[in-house]
């Protein structure tokens, strides 16, 4: 259970309040993070989203995680997706498309950190004959994210 990744997903709108009990509460307990707040979060029903949000914010405070903006959330997510690409848990094209979506969610025209992934994903759609090349470029960029952004 990676609370920082959960926070990043939540900030980007990729982790809904309804999923917090399972994704943060239950998984946190399974990972050995045994706090009263996590226990309470883990037993909430999906329709208790306001309470789930409040408890998640409290958990972030308990673990001393500062608030993050969408750009930093996207960077955290990019490291995670890059690791999954390199471990073959996610195809290069799927990973690049997810990061393209994350970049859109940042909603900042000056945010260009994920542009290599975005370019490759967009070109994959229009140049199917160059799939190997673009997959290779996505893997290279994933390596950079894992090595230089950890």
PLM features: what roles do these ranges have?
Residues 1-150:
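Acidic, Ser/Pro/Thr-rich low-complexity regulatory regions
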